[in-house]
Amino acid sequence: MLAHEIRARVARGEVSPLEVAQAYLKRVQELDPGLGAFLSLNERLLEEAEAVDPGLPLAGLVVAVKDNIATRGLRTTAGSRLLENFVPPYEATAVARLKALGALVLGKTNLDEFGMGSSTEHSAFFPTKNPFDPDRVPGGSSGGSAAALAADLAPLALGSDTGGSVRQPAAFCGVYGLKPTYGRVSRFGLIAYASSLDQIGPMARSVRDLALLMDAVAGPDPLDATSLDLPPRFQEALEGPLPPLRLGVVREALAGNSPGVERALEEALKVFRELGLSVREVSWPSLPQALAAYYILAPAEASSNLARYDGTLYGRRAEGEEVEGMMEATRALFGLEVKRRVLVGTFVLSSGYYEAYYGRAQAFRRRLKAEAQALFREVDLLLLPTTPHPAFPFGARRDPLAMYREDLYTVGANLTGLPALSFPAGFEGHLPVGLQLLAPWGEDERLLRAALAFEEATARAHLKAPLGEAL
């Protein structure tokens, strides 16, 4: 059952918030041991469900929260041994807003350590399996949230997107994932990876559920100086006819895709034309180089952000006879991929190489953004694949560069700050395929309106993996 359908049933008195919480908790306990979507569950869930006011706008809805988003009183690990027992004394703004409207945190979902990865294989605890094929990855780094949705272990989820970490797992698991305009959702309480790129993003199994979630979490926040004063009107934007829109298909993303992705793109273009959109091919010339710039800028910011984990203030502290030895031993607890990115980031920020790498990457970022702004003077939306192929098998991307190439089509939205939405667009065999829409800065609602029209024309909502009995 979809989130807006659950909410309607609660409002009519057909089911109570407690009954909803009990049903999802039972399903998680039955199915998640074989899936690994959750790192921890909210032990007070049923108590909180019994106490919630059923008249609140989101009463009856439980939310799976990625485990790099702070939840007061509930363990928040960022998928790292370094924060294995960290219980935040504060709440992320996005979580606080959900709770104020009656939603409940079901549990914390698995991720690549500190959000650094594209498969959830880099979690310090265990990998998450793709509900459509247990031998394949769910994507990352928000793989636990995507898998929980696809298996119907939760009706709504929060992830975070630094270079595609909401959209890529959404594509691999056949769900919706939105990377909002940078600043549209407060980052307060999100454990930082790369602060100029990070963004909390909603995930769901229908566009209406995505709009419900965005209306709850978006909006300005005095605790985040980068948050935007843009009132959310997502559910309102879904009403009425689809306006005439100009759709640009990004030429640089048309080659090298798998047959299923190519077929999904062709079918989507046919649907959008039938919906009245004018379609043309456009060029975003710098997009193929965006990946190289991203893997300079993101590690550079990570090396600064992760310097705080020295064992002196919070997190796990390794033993050492002196402070320096203790700090070295503590940081040795970082996983291999985190160490790799911190080393890269430290190198590109070093005095001898700063301008050659970091300075040039920042200049490229400005050029990429200028090109995108020019494109949106010609079209209203951009369309490209979310990933070049469906989910890959575990262990298939052992070469770090091969794993980094998974972000080829997604990093552009992060570097430019633009909103981007991955939506289910078909299958390659038994594996879901996702496509991606981008809109101009601040026009997140436009993405959802176009995706809803596609969803209604193709019956893509309610897609879930065939696991267990349906709720």
Swiss-Prot record:
Q: Which residues form the active site?
A: 66 (charge relay system), 141 (charge relay system), 165 (acyl-ester intermediate)
- Recall the GO molecular function terms of this protein's record: ATP binding; glutaminyl-tRNA synthase (glutamine-hydrolyzing) activity
User: What keyword terms does UniProt attach to this protein?
Assistant: ATP-binding, Ligase, Nucleotide-binding, Protein biosynthesis
Classification via Gene3D superfamilies? Amidase signature (AS) domain
Which reactions appear under catalytic activity for this entry?
Answer: L-glutamyl-tRNA(Gln) + L-glutamine + ATP + H2O = L-glutaminyl-tRNA(Gln) + L-glutamate + ADP + phosphate + H(+)
* Gene Ontology CC: glutamyl-tRNA(Gln) amidotransferase complex
Listed GO biological process terms: translation
Task: Name the Enzyme Commission number(s) assigned to this protein.
Answer: 6.3.5.7
- Per the record's keyword annotation, is ATP-binding included, yes or no? yes
Output the InterPro entries linked to this UniProt entry.
Amidase, Amidase_CS, Amidase_dom, AS_sf, GatA
Q: Membrane-spanning residues where?
A: none
**Job description of the protein:** Allows the formation of correctly charged Gln-tRNA(Gln) through the transamidation of misacylated Glu-tRNA(Gln) in organisms which lack glutaminyl-tRNA synthetase. The reaction takes place in the presence of glutamine and ATP through an activated gamma-phospho-Glu-tRNA(Gln).
Quaternary structure, per UniProt, is: Heterotrimer of A, B and C subunits.
Q: Which family does it belong to?
A: Belongs to the amidase family. GatA subfamily.
Protein name as catalogued: Glutamyl-tRNA(Gln) amidotransferase subunit A
What is the originating organism of this protein? Thermus thermophilus (strain ATCC BAA-163 / DSM 7039 / HB27)
Instruction: Specify the taxonomic lineage.
Output: Bacteria, Thermotogati, Deinococcota, Deinococci, Thermales
